[in-house]
Amino acid sequence: MNCTLKIIGKGDSVGNNEWIGIDNAHQNNLKNISVKIPKHQLTVFTGVSGSGKSTLVFDTLVAQSRRELNDTFSSYVQHILPKYGRPAVDNITNLPIAIPIEQRKMSGNVRSTVGTYTEIYTFLRLLFSRIGQPFVGYSDAFSFNHPQGKCEVCDGLGFTKKINLKYLVDFNQSLNEDPIDFPTFGNGAWRWKRYAHSGLFDLNKKIKDYSKEELDLLLYAPQQKLASPPEKWPKTALYEGLLPRIKRSIINTDEGKRHRKQLEKFVSTDICPTCQGSRLNAKALSCKIDGHNISDLVAMSLDELQLLIQKIRNSLVQDVKTQINKRLDALITIGLGYLNLARSTDTLSGGEAQRIRIAKHVTSSLNDVMYVLDEPSSGLHPKDIERLYKCLRVLKDQGNTIILVEHNPLLIQRADYIIDVGPGPGVNGGSIQFSGTYGEFLKSDTITSVAMRENERLNNHTNSSFKKWLSVRDKNLNTVQNVSLKMPLNALTILCGVAGSGKSSLAQIVASELIQKGIDVINISQKNIGISLRSTPLTYLDIFDDIRKLFAKANSVSPSLFSYNSKGACPRCKGKGVIVNDMYFMDDVVSECELCHGQRYNQKVLQYDYKDKTIVDILSMTVSQAVDFFSGITRIATGLQAICDVGLGYLKLNQSLSTLSGGELQRIKLSSYLQKKSSVYIIDEPTNGLHLKDIDHLLELFDRLVARGNTIVIIEHSLKVIRQADWLIEMGPEGGKMGGKVVFSGTIDDLKKSNDAITKPYL
C-alpha cells in the first residue's frame, strides 16, 4: 500500500501541527498501528525486546522522513544518496526532518579523533596560530593531515607499522613454491603474477639465493615502469616491491581489515619514534602557549583542558575560546570529561560515540528537527544518565522533538510522553499497549508498567555467607593504580561506577589474578564475535548442520542442498538474503533480495519438507517456537534453549548476527558457554538492550550458575542487577584521571549503611 502525506489544516484532529500522526503502520510485525507523537517533547518508546519499537521508529518514521528529504535533492544527488524503501504505512502527518543518533561505532578512519570529529582541534589550531610562540605558521601548520604540520616519518598517524619479513616470506622457497604468507600473494593469485610475470626473477630460484639487487627489487622497489616488460605483463601496470605494496594497498585499508588476523602475524605497531605519538613535526611542537604545545593540550582530559583554556586571557582569541568552551561544555555535561582529544574515534564504544554525536548536536544551530536515539542509556551509570538527560532537555528546549527507544526506568520516568509497544516479542508484539504521560503509564497494566511498579528486593547476603575469597594487592592497569581488595568466590559480584572509572581495567586485573591461580576464566565481552551477513544464531552455535541433516535424511538428498552457502543458495544474492551496495565513502546500503525475498534459498529447495515444514519455514521461526518444534531432538533443543535462557527467544533462526546489538551478540556468546564447565565468568554489561522483564530471566540464569559453584563477575549499571548482587565493588569517584579508585566494596547491606554518594542514592 502506498504511503501518502496529507497537509493538515488548522482544524484537523491532529491540531496545530503539534502532533506527528502515524496511520495504519504495518511494517514487519506491526499490526496496523495508528498513534500520535507530540512534537517538541521527549517521547520514550518502550516494550519488551523484539516488540516492534525499532520497526515503528526507525523503519517507519525515520525511513519516511529520510525518503521525503532525499526527494528534495536533484537527481544527481539522489543517485549517490542511500536509498530508503517505502515503509508499509498508510499515512504520516506533520513529519519533521529526522536525525537518527544510533549506538554504532564511528568510522574506522585512523585519522579521525575526538578532536577532529568535534571540531575542537580545528579551533585549537586557530588558537596556536594566533597567540602561540614562536609563530610557526597558520592553522595548517598544526594539522597532522597537512604536509606543513604532519610528522613525515609516520605520515601524521602517530604510529608506524613494521613488517617482519621472516614471518611474511619463506626465504627457503622459490616464487613458484608459494613463499609469501598472505592470501592475495598466493601462487597463481593476481598479486603473485606481478612478480612471476615481471621477467625480473627466476621463478625456481630460492629467494635466499637472490643477489642483493634481486632481493631489493623483490622487497623494496618503489613503483616504476618496467624497462622491457614481458608479453604477459599488463600494459598499464606498474611494478612495486613487496613491502611498499603491502604498506600502500593493504595496511590501513578495507582489505587489511578483512585479513586482520593474517596481518597480525607479520605486522607490528609501534609509537612513532620521531613524534612520540603526537602526529606532528618538530616545528609545530615548538610553538607553545603558557608552556604547553598543542600535543600537550590534546593529551589532557577534557576536564583539564577546559580549566587551561579558561585561564587564557587574550582578546585576539576570545571568539576561538568561546567556540572551544561551548563544545567542551557539551561533552563534559554529557559525562565524557574523562576522554581526551587525541583519542581515536574507532576506539570509542558505541555508547561513547553516540554521546559525542549528541553533544555535537547540542551545539548545532538547527531546530525544529526530530532527534531519534536508540537506547542512549546503554553502558551508563545512573549518575551518567542524569547528565545525558540534561543534554536531551537542552536539545528539546531548543525547539526540537526527541524520541528515544529505551528500556531504562530513569529515562522512562523523565519522559514527557510514553508509548509502550507489545505485548510480546515478534509475532506476539506489534501493537500499541499504551500512550500517555508517566503518571498515566504507572496506572496501566502493560508488562513494562507492571515491572516498573514492582518493589525490588535487595540482596541480604552478609560477609559470613562467603567461604572462599580472592585477594588483590597493589595492582596497576591504565587508570587503576595501587588497587587492593578482596572478592568472594562462588558468588555474583558486580563492578559498577561512572563511565571511565576503571571497571574494565579492574575486571582485567581480577581475570589475571584468577588465571595465575590456575582457575578457568571465561571472558564474555561485547566485542565483535566474528560475524558476517551469513552468520545466524544457528551457525554460531553450530547446530545448523544437524537441522540440514534432518532434511537430507527425510528426503534422501545431500545436506548441502539445504545450505544457503552451497547448493541451496539463491542465485541472485548468493545466500545472503540481501543485496549490499557499496557506497564508497558512506555506509553500505543493504536491500532485500528481490528474487528470494530475503529467504536465502533457491526455489528447488522449497520442494522438500520435514514434518510438513520447508527449510525456509523453520528458519522463519523464532528461537522459542523452534524449541517446541525440535523438542524431541536433544542436541538441537538444548542449544536453542540456551538462547532462550539468555532472553533472546524472540530472535529468528535465520536472523543475521550483523543486525544484532552489542548486548544481543554478547548474550549469544554467553549462550554458547552455558553447557561448558567453568568456574569464573566475567561479563561486560549483559543487560544492554534488555527490557526489565528480560533481565529477570538473566538473573535467574546467573542464580543457577552460582548454585552450580561458579563465580560471576559482571560490569553492570542496571539497578535491577545491582540490587541482586552478592558483592558490590564501586569504582570512581569520576572517570579518567579522577577515577581508578575502589570507593566501595561490600554487600548491598553494607552499601545501605555507607556514606556512598554515587550508586546508593539511586537504589
What are these regions (language model features)?
Residues 442-480, 762:
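Flexible nucleotide-interacting loop at or near the entrance of a catalytic core
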Residues 401, 414-420, 723-730:
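Conserved catalytic segment of ABC-fold P-loop ATPases
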Residues 381-390, 692-700:
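Conserved D-loop/post-Walker B switch-helix segment of ABC ATPase nucleotide-binding domains
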Residues 3, 7-347, 353-369, 391, ...:
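P-loop/Walker A nucleotide phosphate-binding surfaces of NTP-dependent enzymes
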Residues 374, 380-381, 684, 690-694:
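ABC-family nucleotide-binding domains
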Residues 405-407, 715-717:
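H-loop/switch region of ABC-family ATPase nucleotide-binding domains
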Residues 115, 420-453, 730-762:
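Conserved beta-strand-loop-alpha-helix hinge in the C-terminal portion
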